[in-house]
Each structure stands twice: as structure tokens, then as C-alpha cells.
Amino acid sequence: MQYKINMYAIVVYDVNVSRQNQIREFLRKYLYHVQRSVFEGEISPSSLYYMKKILQSYIGETDSLIIYVLRDKSCLMDKIVLGEDKDLQIY
């Protein structure tokens, strides 16, 4: 029997405007777009590894991209939204 082990990832980025669309379109293949520069969702370890490799090739010297990895979405203690809630029914 094969078990599916997924993690939960939150990706935030601050990149040059010339790379924003490229990064956004790539991340949409793996995660949910929840804010302008924020994506989150479940992801397999192999997809996370591949995603990191590709994103590394997109990032410039002055860009910043952070990936928070949780064991699973139950490890997220709370989600506090101030302003418009753009929740995509992922919880």
C-alpha cells in the first residue's frame, strides 16, 4: 500500500516586477494564490523539491522568496486575516 505524504507550504515573495508574472504563473501550478505575492497549499515532497529548483532559477540578486514548510495544514495554529478575506476554501 502506498501512502501519500503531503506537506503544507506558504510561499511569499518580493521580486522585480519583470519576474512577477513568471513566478506567479509557475506557483499557480502547485499552490493556491491567496494574496498578491503569497501562495499556500498542500504539496508533496517531490513537488516541493522541483518547485524550489525552478524558483531558484527565476530569482535575481535583489529578489526575495521565502518558503515556510509545515508538516501538514493541521500544524498551522491559526490564520488571522485583517481586511478582505480571500480564503479559497483550503482549510
Swiss-Prot record:
<comment type="subunit">
    <text>Homodimer, forms a heterotetramer with a Cas1 homodimer.</text>
</comment>
<dbReference type="Pfam" id="PF09827">
    <property type="entry name" value="CRISPR_Cas2"/>
</dbReference>
<dbReference type="InterPro" id="IPR019199">
    <property type="entry name" value="Virulence_VapD/CRISPR_Cas2"/>
</dbReference>
<comment type="function">
    <text>CRISPR (clustered regularly interspaced short palindromic repeat), is an adaptive immune system that provides protection against mobile genetic elements (viruses, transposable elements and conjugative plasmids). CRISPR clusters contain sequences complementary to antecedent mobile elements and target invading nucleic acids. CRISPR clusters are transcribed and processed into CRISPR RNA (crRNA). Functions as a ssRNA-specific endoribonuclease. Involved in the integration of spacer DNA into the CRISPR cassette.</text>
</comment>
<keyword id="KW-0460">Magnesium</keyword>
<keyword id="KW-0051">Antiviral defense</keyword>
<comment type="similarity">
    <text>Belongs to the CRISPR-associated endoribonuclease Cas2 protein family.</text>
</comment>
<protein>
    <recommendedName>
        <fullName>CRISPR-associated endoribonuclease Cas2</fullName>
        <ecNumber>3.1.-.-</ecNumber>
    </recommendedName>
</protein>
<keyword id="KW-0479">Metal-binding</keyword>
<dbReference type="GO" id="GO:0051607">
    <property type="term" value="P:defense response to virus"/>
</dbReference>
<dbReference type="GO" id="GO:0004521">
    <property type="term" value="F:RNA endonuclease activity"/>
</dbReference>
<dbReference type="GO" id="GO:0043571">
    <property type="term" value="P:maintenance of CRISPR repeat elements"/>
</dbReference>
<keyword id="KW-0540">Nuclease</keyword>
<feature type="binding site">
    <location>
        <position position="14"/>
    </location>
    <ligand>
        <name>Mg(2+)</name>
    </ligand>
</feature>
<keyword id="KW-0378">Hydrolase</keyword>
<keyword id="KW-0255">Endonuclease</keyword>
<dbReference type="GO" id="GO:0046872">
    <property type="term" value="F:metal ion binding"/>
</dbReference>
<dbReference type="InterPro" id="IPR021127">
    <property type="entry name" value="CRISPR_associated_Cas2"/>
</dbReference>
